[in-house]
Amino acid sequence: MVVNNNDLATFKIDNSFYPEIKLLITIKSFDLQAIRERYLKNKNKKSNRTGSVARREIATGGIAELTIKNGEITHSEVLTELPEPRGVDSFDEITAFSSENRVYLLNNNSITTITNPWFSYIHTIDIEKSQKKRMLVSSSGFDSIFEYSLEEQKKMFEWFAWENGFDHGLDPESGEKLFLTRNEEKAAQYEAEGKKYLFISDPAAQTLPTAKRAAFINSVVYDPVDKNNVIATFFHEGTVYEIDRNTGQAGKALGGLKNPHGGMKLEFNRYAGTSTTGGEIITGNTYSQTCYNFENLKGKQDFLIDMQWVQNTKIIE
């Protein structure tokens, strides 16, 4: 593996090369203190996995808009408050955003709600930009991906990690493998083999905390090069995968990331992802990588100590 490291603290600060930027963002929770306390509490789990170990009360967050000009925030406004919004995407007259286990679609001055019993902890939404007829949804709570038509709001595609080679998480208390399934016959097989398992038979009533998930797919986007593929980010494994929609097979595109978010394909055989707890943005593939490190930049609050958390990356054209 060839790695080229870049410390952003050594870069020159220049805010003159880009125009005014308008952003639409999600704020998962306004209670940042509670998030920090959960992180510290769960830091020493035996499974060594980042994330909550039990279902918690849903927090209130919001959708906000920001304007950045010459390196300064010149406008900020919370547009609405709702339960834990994470995913948001907007293109031309279409806007879609998520709230925990549902998707809201705004199109031509109308709003439609899309639900699915397997929607849980939705993290991202990606509108297909060329024809504007489809969107992808990452249902992180059940390690799954969905595609819906924008016009009819019909499900067009689904993919579950458990049924495509990623069939177990870890018990956060013991560190043992915990096999996951929504299939009754598979659950019976695990029972007969004496394996520890969790059978999700009623997704509306059952939940799967972050630390127990097999993949924790926290983003999925369309492949701009190959329409047969989608690009998904696996938080626990630290990998960006390229998933073939026809076969269900997942091929590793970018690895070695720490609790990543926001995987994407930049061009043929070149990908990008945010190595969140590594404090880096990484581009490249499985053979060669370029890393942009945020660790030494000024402005981090003292209580974070040596913790890094770079949540996501967007390409501004």
Regions found by a protein language model. Give the residues of each.
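Conserved beta-strand positions in repeat-built beta-propeller and related beta-rich domains
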Residues: I25-K41, K46-R49, R55-E57, A96-E100, ...
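Repeated scaffold domains used in trafficking and secretory/extracellular systems
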Residues: N6-D14, T80-D92, S120-I127, H168-D171, ...
